[in-house]
Amino acid sequence: MPEQLNTRVEDCFLQAESFFKRSFKRPQVSLKLRGQKAGVAHLHENLLRFNPQLYRENSQHFLKQTVAHEVAHLIAHQLFGERIQPHGEEWQLIMRGVYELPPDRCHTYEVKRRQVTRYIYRCPCADSDFPFSSQRHGMVAQGRRYLCRRCRQTLVFTGETRVE
């Protein structure tokens, strides 16, 4: 999987070098990105980070568009310096002129939300549930108390959990 990604990064740099008739410093490439972002270019570290899950699920479009998008950020930074907008004219010029791709700011990949466990707490005064995150539930285990806003009584764990 990373071989194709590295090959595409190199191809993008070769295209830019041919277009601008100069060489560019190659970045370090990492697949350590999670969440909603498909890719991130760290300009000062000369580092590209890509989301392996989104790459696996959308590999063809990812290789074509996302890799070029992130490489274009590094090329724009090396060519035009610090004082440019992330998706400004310079970056758009590279996307259109060098890679002949639309300068799309955001991807449209479907991002699966991670499942979260909620711990159900109740108050003696009302028939209401208070779903706690695992972090807050852990704080209760360490002795922290949470109070009902209505009656000021301590919320009590019911033993129930819910996956959302």
Curated annotation (Swiss-Prot):
It is found in: Cytoplasm. One of its GO terms (molecular function) is zinc ion binding. Binds 1 zinc ion. Pfam families: SprT-like (PF10263). The active site is at E70. Residues 12-157 form the SprT-like domain. Keywords: Cytoplasm, Metal-binding, Zinc. InterPro entries: SprT-like_domain, Uncharacterised_SprT. The keyword Zinc applies. Zn(2+) binds at H69, H73. Its cofactor is Zn(2+). It comes from the Bacteria. Signal peptide: none annotated. GO terms for biological process: response to stress. One of its GO terms (cellular component) is cytoplasm. Belongs to the SprT family. This is Protein SprT. The gene is sprT.
